[in-house]
């Protein structure tokens, strides 16, 4: 598992016990991405770029398949996403959250911010 600078900082800002809980819960290999539990995982897509979302406790972990494993872009509290959807005037239906996120430029700016800080 590879964290970019921004996602590493987001994890480091959490209490140590919560960090351990999230990392214990979020353990997967790139080949696991072919058989995901739809209740915990989602996909956010745009222009052929696929990010995956994992629901861990009150957090959302956004990541992608990487040649060296799994690259984590962001670790966000679920209310951060809800606030983002609210500010973007998007529906807050959990079932369509990923589809709506994939269509918004602001979400991809949030992800790109993490890539620039590697």
Question: What are the roles of these predicted feature ranges?
Answer:
Residues 1, 52, 70:
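A broad, low-specificity signal marking well-ordered, structured residues that form hydrophobic/aromatic
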Residues 1-26, 96-118:
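Arg/Lys-rich, positively charged N-terminal/basic patches that mediate binding to nucleic acids
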Residues 28-55, 110:
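A short, surface-exposed loop/turn module that caps and links secondary-structure elements
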């Amino acid at each position: 598992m590879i964290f970019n600078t921004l996602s590493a900082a987001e994890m480091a800002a959490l209490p140590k016990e919560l960090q351990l809980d999230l990392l214990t819960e979020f353990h997967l290999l790139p080949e696991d991405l072919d058989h995901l539990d739809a209740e915990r995982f989602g996909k956010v897509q745009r222009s052929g770029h696929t990010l995956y979302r994992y629901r861990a406790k009150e957090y959302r972990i956004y990541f992608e398949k990487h040649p060296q494993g799994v690259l984590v872009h962001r670790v966000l509290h679920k209310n951060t996403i809800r606030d983002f959807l609210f500010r973007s005037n998007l529906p807050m239906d959990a079932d369509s959250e990923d589809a709506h996120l994939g269509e918004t430029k602001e979400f991809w700016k949030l992800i790109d911010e993490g890539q620039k800080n590697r």
